[in-house]
Amino acid sequence: MTEAALQQYIQAIRPADRAAMDAARERQAELAKPPGSLGALEDMSIRLAGITGQVCPKMGKCRVAVFAADNGVVDEGVSCAPRSVTLQQAINMTRRRTGMSAMAAAFGDDVAVVDVGIAADVPGVGILDRKVRRGTGNIAVEDAMTRPEALAAMAVGMEQAARARADSITALGIGEMGIGNTSTSAAVLSVLTGADIEAVTGRGGGLTDEGFARKKDVLRRALTRRAVDKDDVLDVLCAVGGLDIAAMTGAFLGCARERIPAAVDGFISVVAALCAVTLCPEVRDYLFLSHDSYEVGYRLAADRLGLEPCLHLGMRLGEGSGCPLLFRVLEGACGVMAGMATFAQAAIQDDYLDEIRAGDSFTVDKP
């Protein structure tokens, strides 16, 4: 993919269908319940209507696409796990033996594992070979990748969105597997937002105090190694990003292009979503944050997106583990829209709601 082709791709992305959203909002008002009583489920159903163009959208088959890649910054000792874990966990995902893939199996969701930059030969075990290069450069001393490589990785993500559309997937989760990618994600988020590295860097898989201090020092070196144009997402990805983040950025763009609801997982996923929205603000219409990741920096990225996470479970596994859970909530939101009776159908007089409807808001005191 060339930069010109990327711009053409982005220009074809359209915002959600506002007319369908208005119609869905009207239907919500007709359902036999107090206004707003289903909380975020109501907003989800309205947003899904805008994505699909259907007032009563339906959820069918769902999929989690996982982009696996290694990160050269691991050489600096920023992770408690060795580089080899990237490949092994990617293989385990195909066997449905990781946290995310076990949940997906329990719910009957598809899982697609894509090698976009594993630093090893990958055996034929069900992993899709889309390797751009064997891991990234060490961002403490060099760029992670070139612009053509970043574009190639983004194209891998776009391909997965197109494949999801061809396979009639109704929601696509965007996950990752890559030792060291909390470091690259923190660096990308720091550049995009201007936040200090201290505010966006966590312990990842469980660093000791010494390892955590080293991680922050390495990232400061990476961010001062050369000037990075925060308004040029490609430059940010090339300087301090990862192939997984680039591919996920492309996948989020692809979901918007294909009009597929996109499930955002944790820290790495939300940073990639922010990259995509920075490139194309319309992408935001297609994003659903699955859970409030416990990883430092997640909340900043979510706030920049202007979206609220669906679930609050203290999770920080990554992989796309929040996506299968979000799919179930989206199914519930769709089920209400399609199956719940209206006041007329339920033979309920709704005059008692006039006072609530006339008010500016409806709140419930929490204990």
Residues covered by each model-derived region:
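N-terminal loops that bind phosphate or other acidic moieties
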Residues: 1-367
